[in-house]
C-alpha cells in the first residue's frame, strides 16, 4: 500500500488469543512508546513482558501486552477483538466499531461508594479526572445527585492526557447524600451522566 496514506497501526500480542488492536496512527504518534521496563526493572510477565505498547489517551485495553508485531495500514483490520468483543451497542440494536479514545471522565475515590461516614462535619471529597483528548479544565462536584454542582480544586501540574487529582470541601450535616463528579476538558467536552449515555447508546 501507499505509505503516505497510512492512517492506522495494528498491534498484536503473543498471548494465547493473539490480542490484536487497531489504533489511529495520529494517536500512536502522540507520545506513544513501546515499554520494556517499569519502576527501574524489566516489565513483569503479568504487565506484558518483554514489550508492551503504551498509547496515552487511548483506553488501556489497546495497550497490547506481550507485543510481537506492529503493522501500519490505510484502513482498520477489523480483528476479532474489534468486531466481536469490543463494540459499542446502539439503541436501534446495531453496533459500531469500538472507540478506543478515552473520553473525559472523573471518579470520586473518597468517600467511596457505599461507605458509611462515621462522623458529621468536614470531609474532603477527592477523586481523579482525565481526558484522552487534552487537559482537564475543570471538575464539578454534586452532593445531591446532580441537582446542584459546585467547582472543585485541581491539583497541579495539570498535564496533557494525564490524571488530575481534585478536591472538594464538604461539611456533612448527617443528611442522605449522593456524591457525583463531572469533568470538562480542554475541547469543551463535558462528562455525561449515565442516563445521558443510555439515551445515546442504549446500554
Regions found by a protein language model. Name each.
Residues 1-203:
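Structured, non-membrane catalytic/scaffold regions adjacent to prosthetic-group chemistry
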Amino acid at each position: 500500500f501507499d505509505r503516505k496514506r497510512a492512517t492506522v497501526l495494528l498491534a498484536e500480542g503473543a498471548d494465547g488469543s493473539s490480542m490484536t488492536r487497531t489504533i489511529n496512527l495520529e494517536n500512536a504518534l502522540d507520545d506513544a512508546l513501546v515499554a520494556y521496563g517499569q519502576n527501574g526493572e524489566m516489565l513483569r510477565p503479568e504487565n506484558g513482558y518483554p514489550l508492551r505498547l503504551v498509547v496515552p489517551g487511548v483506553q488501556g485495553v489497546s495497550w497490547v501486552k506481550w507485543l510481537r508485531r506492529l503493522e501500519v495500514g490505510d484502513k482498520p483490520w477489523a480483528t476479532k477483538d474489534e468486531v466481536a468483543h469490543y463494540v459499542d451497542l446502539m439503541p436501534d440494536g446495531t453496533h459500531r466499531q469500538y472507540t478506543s479514545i478515552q473520553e473525559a471522565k472523573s471518579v470520586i475515590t473518597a468517600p467511596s461508594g457505599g461507605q458509611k461516614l462515621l462522623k458529621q462535619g468536614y470531609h474532603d471529597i477527592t477523586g481523579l479526572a482525565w481526558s484522552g483528548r487534552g487537559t482537564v479544565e475543570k471538575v464539578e462536584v454534586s452532593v445531591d445527585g446532580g441537582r446542584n454542582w459546585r467547582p472543585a480544586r485541581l491539583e497541579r501540574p495539570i498535564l496533557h492526557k494525564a490524571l488530575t487529582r481534585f478536591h472538594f470541601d464538604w461539611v456533612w450535616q448527617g443528611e442522605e447524600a449522593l456524591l457525583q463528579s463531572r469533568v470538562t476538558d480542554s475541547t469543551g467536552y463535558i462528562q455525561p451522566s449515565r442516563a445521558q449515555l443510555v439515551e445515546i447508546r442504549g446500554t
